[in-house]
C-alpha cells in the first residue's frame, strides 16, 4: 500500500477517521466501515483498490435522528491487509485521540482530503460564506492540516481544543477556504461526490462589493512588544510597526495587564 499514491493516501485517511479495526480470537478480525448509503460508491472504490476479498453490504435501522437510516458497510477480513493498515497507523479499537499521520512518506493532499471527507465539512455558512473545516480529537491530525493549510494558502491556524468537548475544530473561511478546497479537490481526484460538488460550488463564490478581507493575524514578537512599551505614543508605535493604532493599543493593554507575558 504505497501512500505516495493519492488514492491510497485518501483511503487511509478516510479509514483512520471512519474505519474500525476489530481484533478477534487468534488471527481473526475485520476492518469495518459504515457510512450513509448515499456515499456507498466510495466504499466500492476502496473495494477495487484493495487486492483482497471484501464485501459491501447495506442495512436499514432506526436511529436517534431518523425513523429509518440506510447505511453501506465495507468489510475486509484479510489478516495481511489488517496488519498492513495497523502498521501504517490504524489502531485496533478506539482511535480518535491516538491516530496520527503515517510515519512513511505519503501524499498529504490525498490523505487530508480523505480525513475531511470522513470527518470534515465543505460548504457555506448560514450567511453564505464558504468554509472548510475538520473536527478531530488528535493533536497530530490537527497539526498536519494546519501545516498543510499554511503551505497551500499562507494562512496560519493556532491549535486549541474546544472547552466543551476537548475537540479541535480547524476552520478556514472565505478566500482561504476557496484556495484550500481548490487545492484538495482537483478534477478527477478520489473523493465523496457530494463533497466534490460542494468544493466546486465554493469556486463560484465572490465577495460582496465593499466587503474587505479580514487583515491577517499579527504575530507579535518580543522586539515588537518592547517597541510598544517604550514608544512615546501609540501613534509612534503604530507608525514604526506598520499596524493600526487600535491593534497596537489592544496589544499594549494586554502587556500592561498581564494578559500576555512581557518580553524577555
What positions do the PLM features span?
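Internal intein/HINT superfamily modules and their associated LAGLIDADG
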Residues: 1-264
